[in-house]
């Protein structure tokens, strides 16, 4: 079967926004107008098509990027194929947004007309900048009290540092919003609000004529800057035709020079069809964006893969999901070549082969089996064994590793334990499945406490994962409070001379050791023997080292593992009959316990390297707050229109920080933190910790 739609007629795009900007409603409208949905699902009914996990329907927020294929007849009457990826708008799920953006060619940024550019919009916009994704902006909820299109346009410049290019103006606002002025055609488009009704095309209202002229002039001035010939013609007094103007806007949008801005209200069905036309006219086809880069596995040199069916097959797995009916599904974007059911592909990241069994085209939560797919397609593959997010699948004869995605390290950890014995095994399986789906979620076992520790991007992130474990895997578990891993060390040298004697009929036990314990700069334990002349026979020396190592795991202050200790065996004595390896082990153990006390034991705590990216207005508050958390500020620098604050802060003082930072900066600041080093705990704090763990 040949390709049904030319690759030039594909549009792979996502809708990105702050939570509550109306993204799910907008996607629903798009699916309705493009003919895939018969009844529109409203988010506040919990009946939305794209939000298909139970938690999403309950909470009314989108957690998982669902990929949907649909079709639209553009202004020219030609049918185009849309692959839409829905993305979450909550800070804890930015990993989902990041991996969606990685496989998109373009995006629509949705703004709430009342709030304008909100914190999460800034975060997502920054991620889109990183991948150089062409974007349009749709100012939604124009019917809302306080809706202000012009303020939203201004904020795109001031908050996002982007060039705004309005291609429409609103007619009326709040309850009086009826339609838009099309600045390219210079016509008014109005809707009566009935579902699916086409726009009525008319003349621009007289009271808006001057404003429309002013904005059209600005539009043309920005658009002609993209092309030298158009610029020269314009300066000589020749205006571009409407089609030429569209072509210039398309070029500038794809080159990320500016961002077309449209407006409407998805909920009231006004402005949706012109937005779909704009997707066709301004957002790129897979062939309009640069060919994807990768590393040729055979030559280890950089290579590219063109968006063409003739090129060798290459695709990127960008998401893994557990589907209640099909099991594990791997979503992949085909960048080049043609994929046929039943072929074997190379996973070049894992070095393993994968057979493509079942291939599905997804429509939110319904699915259609397909036998082949082409460059530009987004497909769901069932039953892959080895592939995880970010892996490349390709033609085994032309192996390539496509650019990988970067995933942030988790910032919060909690201990979790199953409620019953029966839950124990199921919990292990559930956690492994969830970790395979979500690269920002990690699972590990704490060697010291034996507990299972889960780590993620925030409190909501972990809440939802524990909740999913309960619903999808029927595992009941208790989650604990976040914990800090302290350590202990010594501050000075101490020499210990210890004799172990035990006489209890028959042969006894005897061992004498003389050891110097001292601190050293590393984190590891160093053992050295300086025995000369056989005061301790060679065969007993390993017993001395083993004895010390066996008690290093629990320090004298609060039972935490010890770091940075050097032990030097300098002398000792033995008995021909009563000495043994075990006797020397016992003697060195007791010597270490005594030595750790004498050598000035101290508590150490993990210090985190913290980076906060904040708008300038909140820098003072952020620095003050970090100081109050015993933080040391190491510097600030400008990054675009934001400020970066770098600091070293004890982990114990960072719990709950994400919520404090959100409220302090109205959600506009972000932070990352990673472990840097251990440092002595201040005396007052150390006493509290010792009491707690004694």
Swiss-Prot record:
Superkingdom of the organism of origin = Bacteria
A Pfam match = EFG_IV
Its main localization is cytoplasm
Q: Which cysteines are joined by disulfide bonds?
A: none
State the Gene Ontology terms under molecular function. Answer: GTP binding; GTPase activity; guanosine tetraphosphate binding; translation elongation factor activity
All copies of the tr-type G domain together span 8-287
A single GO cellular-component term from the record reads: cytoplasm
What is one GO biological process annotated to this record? Answer: ribosome disassembly
Name the keywords, alphabetized.
Cytoplasm, Elongation factor, GTP-binding, Nucleotide-binding, Protein biosynthesis
Query: Which positions does UniProt annotate for GTP binding?
Result: 17-24, 86-90, 140-143
Q: Which family does it belong to?
A: Belongs to the TRAFAC class translation factor GTPase superfamily. Classic translation factor GTPase family. EF-G/EF-2 subfamily.
Q: Which PANTHER family match?
A: RIBOSOME-RELEASING FACTOR 2, MITOCHONDRIAL, TRANSLATION ELONGATION FACTOR G-RELATED
The UniProt function text for this chain reads: Catalyzes the GTP-dependent ribosomal translocation step during translation elongation. During this step, the ribosome changes from the pre-translocational (PRE) to the post-translocational (POST) state as the newly formed A-site-bound peptidyl-tRNA and P-site-bound deacylated tRNA move to the P and E sites, respectively. Catalyzes the coordinated movement of the two tRNA molecules, the mRNA and conformational changes in the ribosome.
Protein name (database record): Elongation factor G
Species annotation: Brucella suis (strain ATCC 23445 / NCTC 10510)
């Amino acid at each position: 079967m040949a390709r049904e739609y030319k690759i030039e007629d594909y549009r792979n795009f996502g809708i990105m926004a702050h939570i509550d900007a109306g993204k799910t409603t907008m996607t629903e409208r798009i699916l309705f107008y493009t003919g895939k949905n018969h009844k529109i699902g409203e988010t506040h009914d919990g009946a939305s098509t794209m939000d298909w996990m139970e938690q999403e329907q309950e909470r009314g927020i989108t957690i998982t990027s669902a990929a949907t294929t649909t079709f639209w007849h553009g202004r020219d009457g030609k049918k185009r194929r849309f692959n839409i990826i829905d993305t979450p708008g909550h800070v804890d799920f930015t990993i989902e947004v990041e991996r969606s953006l990685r496989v998109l060619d373009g995006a629509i940024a949705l703004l709430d007309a009342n709030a304008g550019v909100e914190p999460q919009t800034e975060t997502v916009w920054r991620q889109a900048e990183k991948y150089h994704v062409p974007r349009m902006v749709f100012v939604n909820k124009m019917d809302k009290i306080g809706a202000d299109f012009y303020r939203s346009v201004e904020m795109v410049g001031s908050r996002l540092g982007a060039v705004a290019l309005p291609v429409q103006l609103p007619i009326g606002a709040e309850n009086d919003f009826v339609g838009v002025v099309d600045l390219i055609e210079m016509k008014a488009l109005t809707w009566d609000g009935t579902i699916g009704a086409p726009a009525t095309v008319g003349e621009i209202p007289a009271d808006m004529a001057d404003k429309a002229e002013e904005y059209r002039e600005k539009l043309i001035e920005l658009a002609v800057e993209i092309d030298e010939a158009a610029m020269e013609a314009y300066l000589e007094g020749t205006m571009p035709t409407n089609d030429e103007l569209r072509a210039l806007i398309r070029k500038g949008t794809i080159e990320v020079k500016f961002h077309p801005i449209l407006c409407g209200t998805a909920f009231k069905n006004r402005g949706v069809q012109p937005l779909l036309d704009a997707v066709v006219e301004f957002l790129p086809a897979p062939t309009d964006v640069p060919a994807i880069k990768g590393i040729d596995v055979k030559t280890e040199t950089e290579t590219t893969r063109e968006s063409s069916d003739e090129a060798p097959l290459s695709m990127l797995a960008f998401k893994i999901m557990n589907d209640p009916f099909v099991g594990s599904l791997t979503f992949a974007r085909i960048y080049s070549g043609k994929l046929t059911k039943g072929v074997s592909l190379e996973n070049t990241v894992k070095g393993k082969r994968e057979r493509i069994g079942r291939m599905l085209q997804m429509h939110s939560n319904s699915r259609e089996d397909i036998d082949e797919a082409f460059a530009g397609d987004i497909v769901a593959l069932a039953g892959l064994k080895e592939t995880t997010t970010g892996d490349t699948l390709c033609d085994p004869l032309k192996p390539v590793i496509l650019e990988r995605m970067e995933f942030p390290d988790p910032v919060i950890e909690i201990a979790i334990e199953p409620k019953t014995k029966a839950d124990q095994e199921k919990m292990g399986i559930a956690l492994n499945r969830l970790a395979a789906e979500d690269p920002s979620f990690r699972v590990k076992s704490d060697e010291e406490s034996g507990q299972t520790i889960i780590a993620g991007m925030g409190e909501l992130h972990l809440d939802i994962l524990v909740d999913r474990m309960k619903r999808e895997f029927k595992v009941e578990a208790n989650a604990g409070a976040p914990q800090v891993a302290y350590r202990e060390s010594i501050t000075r040298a101490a020499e210990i001379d210890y004799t172990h004697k035990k006489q209890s009929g028959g042969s006894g036990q005897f061992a004498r050791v003389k050891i110097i314990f001292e601190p050293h700069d590393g984190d590891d334990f160093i053992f050295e023997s300086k025995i000369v002349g056989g005061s301790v026979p060679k065969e007993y020396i390993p017993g001395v080292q083993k004895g010390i190592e066996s008690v290093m795991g629990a320090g004298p202050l609060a039972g935490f593992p010890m770091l940075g200790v050097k032990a030097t065996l300098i002398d000792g004595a033995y008995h021909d009959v009563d000495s043994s390896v075990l006797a020397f082990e016992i003697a060195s153990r007791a010597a270490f316990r005594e030595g750790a006390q004498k050598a000035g034991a101290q508590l150490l705590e993990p210090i985190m390297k913290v980076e906060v990216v904040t708008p300038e207005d909140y820098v003072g508050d952020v620095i003050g707050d970090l100081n109050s958390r015993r933080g040391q500020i190491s510097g600030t620098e400008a990054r675009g229109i934001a400020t970066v604050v770098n600091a070293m802060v004890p982990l114990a003082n960072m719990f709950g920080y994400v919520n404090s930072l959100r409220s302090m900066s109205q959600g506009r600041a972000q932070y990352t933190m990673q472990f840097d080093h251990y440092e002595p705990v201040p005396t007052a704090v150390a006493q509290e910790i010792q009491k707690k763990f004694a």
